[in-house]
Amino acid sequence: MFALDAVICNTDRHFGNFGFFIDSKTNKIIAPAPLFDHGNSLFNYAGEDDFASEKALSVYADTLLPCVYDDFIGTAKAVLTAEHKEGLRKLLNFRFKRHSRYNLSPKYLALIEKQVRERARRLLEK
């Protein structure tokens, strides 16, 4: 959860939008529930000026903070597992699959793709 939120800059992860599957007989945690509520991510509130360039979007991304912990990258790095790192390595070549009719502008998509790749790279740095 922390790694994904760091990659997509999900500013709205809070204690009401993640959970766990619980064994009803033992009342023990079985597994984390699937993640949901990623609506405040991928620079959805960024303005036209923020999408003016790769640098501008990077500066904007660095102003975003998670809702209930201190920072995206540091918190995610503290809990990364080998499995997380494997997934992050796959994001180093990330590209959105374009829909035939519904897309942001090619410029916006390219800038967001670069941010996803860069944020994955930052998480993998030692």
Which ranges hold each PLM region?
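Anionic ligand-binding catalytic core segments
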Residues: 1-10, 15, 19-126
